[in-house]
Amino acid sequence: MQKRVRNRLITIIICFCSAFLGISIILYNLEKNIVFFLPPSKINEIEQGKELRVGGLVKTDSINKIADDKISFVITDNIKDCEILYQGALPALFRKGQGIIAIGQLSNGKFIARQLLAKHDENYRPPQ
């Protein structure tokens, strides 16, 4: 009887450890694929040069074309504004008032984006 209880206990412990390990691996991989972002009012708490995601609405009349593929614009969370500098092709849904997530680094009070993601609502239809 003692051996039977010990074997059952070992089996239960192995099952719990396996389940914990499996859930940990799944959560670790999901964290890499989920797009978390900070609003402009929270980015001052982040150190300069650290890669982060900033999200907000493109402010009206803030889009300035600097060169052929360089653009500057301001995003806001209605508390604070953040100037974004971006070089590259803009997403098709990019426009004033649109929700944007910028991925890049904070440098001298400006956010240098290496990638832009345009947010859309549940009624998304690709541009024609």
Curated annotation (Swiss-Prot):
Molecular function as annotated in GO: heme binding; metal ion binding
InterPro entries per record: CcmE, CcmE-like_sf, NA-bd_OB-fold
Origin superkingdom: Bacteria
A GO-annotated cellular component: plasma membrane
Membrane topology: Single-pass type II membrane protein
Assigned keywords, A-Z: Cell inner membrane, Cell membrane, Cytochrome c-type biogenesis, Heme, Iron, Membrane, Metal-binding, Signal-anchor, Transmembrane, Transmembrane helix
Pfam families linked: CcmE (PF03100)
Spans within the Periplasmic topological domain: 30-128
Segments crossing the lipid bilayer: 9-29
GO biological process, one term: cytochrome complex assembly
Main location: membrane
Residues the record lists as binding heme: 120, 124
Heme among keywords: yes
Cytoplasmic side: 1-8
Cellular localisation: Cell inner membrane
Function: Heme chaperone required for the biogenesis of c-type cytochromes. Transiently binds heme delivered by CcmC and transfers the heme to apo-cytochromes in a process facilitated by CcmF and CcmH.
Protein family membership: Belongs to the CcmE/CycJ family.
Protein name: Cytochrome c-type biogenesis protein CcmE
Lineage: Bacteria, Pseudomonadati, Pseudomonadota, Alphaproteobacteria, Rickettsiales
